[in-house]
Regions:
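Secondary-structure transition/capping motifs at alpha-helix termini
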Residues: 94-100, 120-126, 144-155, 248-250
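Short, cysteine/histidine-rich loop/knuckle motifs that typically chelate Zn2+
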Residues: 262-263, 275
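Cys/His-rich microdomains that often coordinate metals
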Residues: 265-269
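Single conserved hydrophobic/aromatic residue that forms the stacking wall/gate
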Residues: 271-275, 279-282
Length: 282
């Protein structure tokens, strides 16, 4: 399971009780929403058509991941499948039954909602005029997961992909296919999942409240972040943000700048000033 994966509810048929430990994810395939938007040329009718084509391709790739696991004997990894890390199967028993019925999840990931909406509407998804389109994109992916789940008895769910190195890979592929599109492909990254773009001026509480609406539509996993300055001497503010997270959003965390000077041992925040060889302390 990834760092932001959510386990969907599963009731053990033998005990009739919910079970969370020992479960796992079969894999993730991520759709590049920015590519879908750029491929449509800004035409909404084409967008939805291409969107469905790309989702079908993702579905095919997810099925390939699933088929790769089918037939795996428990002997392939005894600690996982026989000794209780994930299951307690018999020697030689196949893991197939764990791939169906919701015991394990399989995830449709997504990336670049901000750039997708920006290209299609000319506005950020934080804008009231563009937000409905952003939510409709999220809902459409959820609907597809529900459709696949009913047809195959596998727990497909929508997942806010961490991206990490993939953000650079996606960005470079977009630049190669579409060139530099101002505000869309002019950076060597695309925005993670539903996140507010890093360039937007927005306070922590507004950001968390806004993103909570999208996190609800990402039941396979998601996380929101807010960046704060050094807060060692302002713990009340930290607690107020944490309380807001607790009250408004499922999963979020604070990022804070942490610097360390190897000469004097200063360990708060350092910023560059006009002279490039000097640092200022804050």
């Amino acid at each position: 399971m990834g760092c932001r994966s959510f386990l969907t509810p599963y009731v053990d048929p033998e005990t009739g009780k919910p079970k969370y430990y020992g479960r796992f994810n079969q894999g993730v395939v991520t759709i590049n929403l920015v590519d879908v938007a750029l491929s449509s040329g800004g035409n909404f009718e084409k967008f939805w058509k291409i969107f469905d084509e790309r989702l079908a391709l993702c579905h095919k790739a997810l099925q390939a991941r699933h088929q790769r696991l089918m037939g795996t004997p428990s002997d392939a990894a005894p600690i996982l499948w026989q000794y209780g890390a994930l299951a307690r199967l018999k020697k030689g028993e196949k893991i197939d039954k764990l791939l169906f019925g919701g015991y394990s999840t399989i995830s449709l990931g997504y990336a670049g909602l901000y750039e997708c909406v920006k290209y299609m509407t000319g506005k950020s998804h934080t804008d009231a005029g563009a937000k409905p389109f952003a939510l409709s994109v999220m809902q459409h992916m959820n609907d597809k997961c529900t459709e696949w789940k009913k047809a195959e008895n596998m727990d497909y769910s929508l997942y806010g992909t961490p991206l990490e190195s993939t953000t650079y890979k996606f960005a470079k592929c977009l630049q190669k296919r579409f060139g530099i599109v101002p505000g869309i492909t002019d950076k060597n990254y695309i925005t993670n999942s539903y996140h507010v773009h890093v360039s937007e001026h927005i306070d922590a509480f507004t950001k968390l409240k806004f993103e909570s609406e999208f996190q609800k539509l990402s039941p396979g996993g998601a996380i929101s972040y807010v960046e704060v300055p050094n807060m060692q001497d302002n713990l009340e503010a930290v607690i107020s943000v944490l309380q807001f997270i607790y009250d408004n959003i499922m999963y979020a965390e604070l990022n804070t700048k942490s610097d360390y000077c190897q000469c004097c041992g200063y360990d708060l925040s350092l910023i560059h000033i006009s002279e490039p060889t000097r640092l200022a302390l804050i």
